[in-house]
């Protein structure tokens, strides 16, 4: 099974950069997009809804031009869930989940903690609730793949120039500790399972020439670690300030 994920920084903007033909040529079984900044019904191009995929969108209830997630599924899921049951966050359109018999795939956009548009205290509040949720579902007899823009990096090798800067977005002590705790408690970074030493980056918050950070990944149940066959970051084309992450798993939905 191939899972592709990307923070698009606006679906229609990314489409104007060539996203649509590229993304549907990657032979992905699941495509997770974040920060779509649109409603499903505002997308005017038919090419965004190929017959080979079932498309699902979660919009910001109050303003669809903010946040938003999407999942494209080659095989129809058993169920689709919007939100995580977090009363302060579900209306923001930051989580969408596809359930299959033994596997759940989520498309997640962690609230930004970067000023001027983000608030670190809000982000940390969301992460606190997410941690409790992930620990609760960890014991379920199913595997989880959470694709998204986490806006966090854990190790120095995941942040370019980490030794020279103290203001790297997503690289605060609190955020790194949160990820470290998650990885000790039954979850793993799918990219690092396949590429333990590869210094790749997925987000350039200050533009193409700025230092990169690997904040985009697929966080998986520990039980899936042995199923990760390969992982890559695609940088040949630019669709947004983020790069697509592609992971192949030795599993069947």
Predicted regions and their residues:
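Active-site-proximal beta-strand elements of phosphoester/diester hydrolases
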Residues: 1-9, 102-114, 147
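Catalytic metal-binding/acid-base residues of hydrolase active sites
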Residues: 9, 36-37, 109-111, 151-153, ...
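Surface-exposed cleft-lining segments at the edges of enzyme active sites
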Residues: 84-86, 110-127, 163-167
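Metal-dependent phosphoesterases centered on the DNase I-like endonuclease/exonuclease/phosphatase
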Residues: 51-54, 126-211
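Structured beta-strand-rich core segments of catalytic domains in phosphoester-bond hydrolases
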Residues: 36-113
